[in-house]
Curated annotation (Swiss-Prot):
GO terms for molecular function: metal ion binding; threonine-type endopeptidase activity. A double ring-shaped homohexamer of HslV is capped on each side by a ring-shaped HslU homohexamer. The assembly of the HslU/HslV complex is dependent on binding of ATP. This is ATP-dependent protease subunit HslV. It comes from the Bacteria. Keywords: Allosteric enzyme, Cytoplasm, Hydrolase, Metal-binding, Protease, Sodium, Threonine protease. The gene is hslV. Its main location: cytoplasm. Na(+) binds at residues 162, 165, 168. It catalyses: ATP-dependent cleavage of peptide bonds with broad specificity. InterPro entries: ATP-dep_Prtase_HsIV_su, Ntn_hydrolases_N, Proteasome_sua/b, Proteasome_suB-type. PANTHER family: ATP-DEPENDENT PROTEASE SUBUNIT HSLV, METALLOPROTEASE TLDD.
Length: 181
C-alpha cells in the first residue's frame, strides 16, 4: 500500500502524548488539492488522539469503526485496536480500504495497518505516511538529544519532514490526549 500526501507523527513525553499531522491533500503525484485538511482528531472525550494517512474517505470509515470499538471497550485503547484489527482483517469491505491509523492515549501509541497489524513502538515515537520516515528520524534525534516536551518535538520534527517530503506541508494540526481524572 503506497500512501502519498501526508505525515502523521506521535510523540509521548513526560506530560503526555501529542499527535501532529500536516494539512496537505494530494491527488495523484502532482496536484495539491488542499493545504489545511485536519487529519488528526481527539476521540473518547479527548483521552485518545488519532491521525490517519491514506485515502480520506477510507480513513473516515476507519475512524468511525475505531471510535465504535473505543466506546464498546470503554476507552481501552489496546483492546479497541486489537478488535479493530480483527475486524479489518475479516471484513471484505474493510480489507480494501487504503489507510493507516496512528492512535494514542497517555500510555500507548499504536499503529494500525491495513494488513491488520497493531504495532506499538518501543521508544514512544511513531509516524505514518509519506513523510513518516523523516518525521520519525527527526523526532528520535530531538528526543534523544534535547529536553524538549512532546509537543515541541512533534512540531519541529513535522517542520523538518515538510522541508524534505514534497507530500507534506507545514500547516499542522496538533492534538494532545487529556489526562484521565
Amino acid at each position: 500500500m503506497e500512501l502519498k500526501g501526508t505525515t502523521i507523527l506521535a510523540v509521548r513525553g513526560a506530560q503526555g502524548v501529542t499527535i501532529a499531522g500536516d494539512g496537505q491533500v494530494t491527488m495523484g503525484q502532482s496536484i495539491v488539492m488542499k493545504h489545511s485538511a485536519r487529519k488528526v482528531r481527539r476521540l473518547y472525550n479527548g483521552r485518545v488522539v488519532a491521525g490517519f494517512a491514506g485515502s480520506t474517505a477510507d480513513a473516515f470509515t476507519l475512524f468511525e469503526h475505531f471510535e465504535a470499538k473505543l466506546e464498546e471497550h470503554r476507552g481501552n485503547l489496546v483492546r479497541a485496536a486489537v478488535e479493530m484489527a480483527k475486524s479489518w482483517r475479516k471484513d471484505k469491505y474493510l480489507r480494501r480500504l487504503e489507510a493507516m491509523l496512528l492512535v494514542a492515549d497517555n500510555e500507548h501509541i499504536l499503529v494500525l495497518s491495513g494488513n491488520g497489524d497493531v504495532i506499538e513502538p518501543d521508544d514512544g515515537i511513531a509516524a505514518i505516511g509519506s513523510g513518516g520516515p523523516y518525521a520519525l528520524a527527526a523526532a528520535r534525534a530531538l528526543a534523544r538529544h534535547t529536553q524538549l516536551d512532546a509537543e515541541t518535538i512533534a512540531r519541529e520534527a513535522m517542520r523538518i519532514a515538510g522541508e524534505i517530503c514534497v507530500f507534506t506541508n507545514d500547516h499542522l494540526t496538533v492534538e494532545s490526549a487529556e489526562t484521565q481524572a
